[in-house]
Amino acid sequence: MTLWINGDWITGQGALRVRRNPVSGEVLWQGNDADAAQVEQACRAARAAFPRWARLSFAERQAVVERFAGLLERNKGELTAIIARETGKPRWEAATEVTAMINKIAISIKAYHVRTGEQRSEMPDGAASLRHRPHGVLAVFGPYNFPGHLPNGHIVPALLAGNTIIFKPSELTPWSGEAVMRLWQQAGLPPGVLNLVQGGRETGQALSALEDLDGLLFTGSANTGYQLRRQLSGQPEKILALEMGGNNPLIIDEVADIDAAVHLTIQSAFVTAGQRCTCARRLLLKSGAQGDAFLARLVAVSQRLTPGNWDDEPQPFIGGLISEQAAQQVVTAWQQLEAMGGRTLLAPRLLQSETSLLTPGIIEMTGVAGVPDEEVFGPLLRVWRYDSFEEAILMANNTRFGLSCGLVSPEREKFDQLLLEARAGIVNWNKPLTGAASTAPFGGIGASGNHRPSAWYAADYCAWPMASLESDSLTLPATLNPGLDFSDEVVR
């Protein structure tokens, strides 16, 4: 029984799904997808639970969420192993994900009060108040690269605001989704407040097509995000928050410490085997001898990155990709770029057949026309050389995406120029593209999102504002508008 609907674990009525470790092939989880009727059932449960959950005080909802945080802490080792085994990422990185989930609780509580709490302003004849109200029933679509942390970034603020939820994990990480749901169950969530439906495309389509849905919170690919946007385009009454990918540029301008810059680049491009939406996909490198030296060092150090299994000792920097198919897609993308005229500096290699262990790839595309503006979701870095900083900014902005952008340079003036001209929601200076602050919004523009950033701003899309003018008594104004007559004289 792998679906959690209205406080009960039930068996899915859809197709059988089996999840294997992407490196070893070990069977980790199996269960049946939710069919359309069960998705409807989950929605009815969420709708029925909404009034009571929304009427609880914030402190009461906060208490449940904080119990969940405590359970995460006590079960950190077990959840770390589940996420690592299912995604293929190393144990150390899965542990940082669970830590981020724990930290998200306190951050979300604070963000609720700052972004969507209550405010009151006194007026001469009363007061003006601002409150926030939950939307109702929200669907949360989770991604596979951070199957605990990223859905958590939607679920926690949505629950705090008073919404009820139908959560569909990625079909590639059902075990992680179930493990997190069991912790929510232990935290004492009332039946129907959070429901879990497993499945792939058909389950997702049934969920997004629900009429009695007040909103959808999505993290995933741009293609799927565009499909959801089209599907809900005629329904402005439904909130839609899209967090999508990027074709992110990292500009290496002047480098004081080559090894430090190489380290930053590897952290930007290859952490999580290149499976972060903020990963650097395009390296824009200044022409000249220093750039040549940097590139040679980058290739040399990247060549030493050997992917390993989740529990290998010593621990590897990167593990496997989410699937063998995903790894093969990266290899295919590299082959296509090479066929277009790209110059391979480091060829990506599958370490063995029927696994997702893939070494990083680096290919120079300077002077090659018609390079697709697409996100390759894996450890493949494309390199372009530039002559002037103005040219670098033009190249950085030459994308339909707009998630992250970074600059390595000792010059504050150049960063200030980039801040003015960059088209990206995250712009970093001498910091990895994959780094983000929990007290800042996280999201992009263009094909990277729809102006509903998550993280610190997640509270914004989990509640709607209600403005009120208030007075505890009613009296006739001393001064009336022209044309109003309240005298006792009878008009004949």
UniProtKB/Swiss-Prot annotation:
PROSITE patterns per the UniProt record, alphabetical: ALDEHYDE_DEHYDR_CYS, ALDEHYDE_DEHYDR_GLU
BP GO terms, sorted: arginine catabolic process to glutamate; arginine catabolic process to succinate
Chain sites annotated for binding NAD(+): G220, S221, A222, N223, T224, G225
Listed InterPro entries: Ald_DH/histidinol_DH (IPR016161), Ald_DH_C (IPR016163), Ald_DH_CS_CYS (IPR016160), Ald_DH_CS_GLU (IPR029510), Ald_DH_N (IPR016162), Aldehyde_DH_dom (IPR015590), SuccinylGlu_semiald_DH_AstD (IPR017649)
GO molecular function, one term: succinylglutamate-semialdehyde dehydrogenase activity
Its EC number(s): 1.2.1.71
Residues annotated as the enzyme's active site: E243, C277
Catalysed reactions listed for this entry: N-succinyl-L-glutamate 5-semialdehyde + NAD(+) + H2O = N-succinyl-L-glutamate + NADH + 2 H(+)
Pfam family, one: Aldedh
Domain of life: Bacteria
Coiled coil: none
Keyword terms: Arginine metabolism, NAD, Oxidoreductase
Record Gene3D superfamilies: Aldehyde Dehydrogenase, Chain A, domain 1, Aldehyde Dehydrogenase, Chain A, domain 2
EC primary class: oxidoreductase
Pathway as given in its UniProt record: Amino-acid degradation; L-arginine degradation via AST pathway; L-glutamate and succinate from L-arginine: step 4/5
Chain's role: Catalyzes the NAD-dependent reduction of succinylglutamate semialdehyde into succinylglutamate.
Similarity field: Belongs to the aldehyde dehydrogenase family. AstD subfamily.
Protein's UniProt name: N-succinylglutamate 5-semialdehyde dehydrogenase
Organism: Escherichia coli (strain ATCC 8739 / DSM 1576 / NBRC 3972 / NCIMB 8545 / WDCM 00012 / Crooks)
